[in-house]
């Protein structure tokens, strides 16, 4: 069973609200880098970059981060995984990095992303943007900017859909009858 919990219009309003919050929090945007966790976090980062550019007339640097090599909760098929890293590596030394992902659940994806970012240098500060926080944390991770808090049961799944990958921007709550 599926329920749309954020429709396309709400999705765009959420991107706009988070963009406004980032601008309001940072008087100067010059030292900010947006880092989106592949796949949907990177697309959300692109949406934020575009909206911030429209609002503040500044194009923030953007980096897409692949954290597969850093994860501790996936079974890898090879003992020597291929690390693809980032599409465009930026110098994060002394910068404020705004890390962006679609769903915050256990916190393990964010922990892996933090490990990956540390390999690029020492950021002055790292802030976290999450489109949907569904609870059930296993690690002490908290987002600085949250699109929507949606408490879920463990047998539910939050599915963020984006234009690039799914042809529509929305969030669905999927209830599994198996568990």
UniProtKB/Swiss-Prot annotation:
InterPro entries: PRibTrfase_dom, PRTase-like, PyrR, PyrR_bifunctional. Substrate binds at residues 39-40, 101-109, 134, 158. It holds the Pfam family Pribosyltran. A motif (PRPP-binding) lies at residues 97-109. Keywords: Glycosyltransferase, Transcription, Transcription regulation, Transferase. One of its GO terms (biological process) is regulation of DNA-templated transcription. It catalyses: UMP + diphosphate = 5-phospho-alpha-D-ribose 1-diphosphate + uracil. Transmembrane segments: none annotated. The keyword Methyltransferase does not apply. It is an enzyme of class 2 (transferase). One of its GO terms (molecular function) is uracil phosphoribosyltransferase activity. Its EC number is 2.4.2.9. Belongs to the purine/pyrimidine phosphoribosyltransferase family. PyrR subfamily. Regulates the transcription of the pyrimidine nucleotide (pyr) operon in response to exogenous pyrimidines. This is Bifunctional protein PyrR. The lineage of its organism: Bacteria, Pseudomonadati, Pseudomonadota, Gammaproteobacteria, Pasteurellales. The gene is pyrR.
